[in-house]
Amino acid sequence: MPMKTLITALLLSAAPLAASHAAPVDQYGYKLPPSMQAKKKAKKAPVKKAAPAVDYTGEFVNFGDWKEVRAFLDDIATRDGFDRAELTTLINQVRYVDAAVQLVKPAPPGKPKNWQAYSKLMIDPVRTDAGIKFWNDNAEALNRAESLYGVPAEIIVGIIGVETVYGRNTGRFRVLDAITTLAFSYPEAPQRRERMEFFRGELEATLLFARQSGTDPLSLKGSFAGALGMPQFMPSSLMKYAVDFDGNGTIDLLNSPSDAIGSVAAFLAAHGWQRELAGPPVYAATVSPNRAWDSLLNQGLTAKYRNGELSAAGVTSATPAPDQLYGLVDLQNGAEPTEYWLANANFFAITQYNRSYFYAMSVVELGRTVRLARSGAAISTSASGM
């Protein structure tokens, strides 16, 4: 036997098969020196990626030099009686906020909608607990708003909870920066020109509100789209629908829960809420396999079908629904079955706050969840007629 083979055999027999802590050997069985041994990397704890920082501050771009901005300022100076020189001084302090531009861009196509995932974000223990406290702290204002405007307390609680978690997340953008940016530099998108016109109207409303209330317009903080306060009113809605519900002579949607409560109720009453409609805004529904009801979908944000028409098309409510007008609402769940609901005019009044079935349904469900939790009642996973 060759000497090398003999040595190898002796080494292998002397160091039997191996404990896990034995030093590594080469192909002949010789122990490798430390410098040649593979270093075992220590496992590192997974590092959480930090969310990208949002630039709330923006940058100066000399808005006052932009031709369209100058024309806009000329118009509102004439129309609303603003001092043109003061407008120039103000606009020269406004910053361009790219974060607002990025945040208004539509979501990439192809990702399926998922109501169950969305609702878990909006109807959670944090919002529920905060909603109970908000209701308890403001029961008098909620009762008064329900009596005056006909909007149930749970719907008001649902909206303020979905919008800002009862004032916790009201926005960190300077409203004047965000709205000016979107009014004159909206990203490429369908109806870009119409969206810019909308935000120019909101910019005018911001300046009118600031003048009327004696507020420095640069001090207003809100969302990336310029929405303000606990209920996230756009400036034009603030001008039209906000109310001084605490009676102190000023409207403060940021710091006065009473003003926020009364203003939400006033908005819904002005957008079609009907106090005389019995029952909840939605009723769970089943649909027939023949899909004769397809033509009832996507008929606008309005209730237009009677129970008989729905039944004839194969749509049945899980619990008896009053004789009212309804729309058929579909809540998609990705790869899971779609949920179907009959929605009356009050549901569609909520969509005037935010034109989304998911939004309106989350308002209804959060309000219901808070009401039941507050009363100590058991909360089922499905509203099924509320």
Task: Describe each model-derived feature in a short phrase.
Residues A19-P24:
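Boundary at the C-terminal end of the N-terminal hydrophobic targeting segment
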Residues S213-Y326, G334-A335:
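Flexible, glycine-rich surface segments
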Residues P112-S263, A269:
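Acidic/His-rich structured neighborhood in mature extracellular/periplasmic domains
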Residues F82-I91, V151-G158, P217-G222, N248-I251, ...:
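Surface-exposed patches in mature extracellular/periplasmic domains of secreted proteins
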Residues T286-M386:
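C-terminal soluble interaction/assembly domains
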Residues M1-I7:
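Bacterial N-terminal signal peptides that target proteins for export
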Residues V25-D137, N143-E146:
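An acidic, Gly/Ser/Thr/Pro-rich helix-cap/linker signature
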Residues A9-P16:
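Bacterial N-terminal signal peptides
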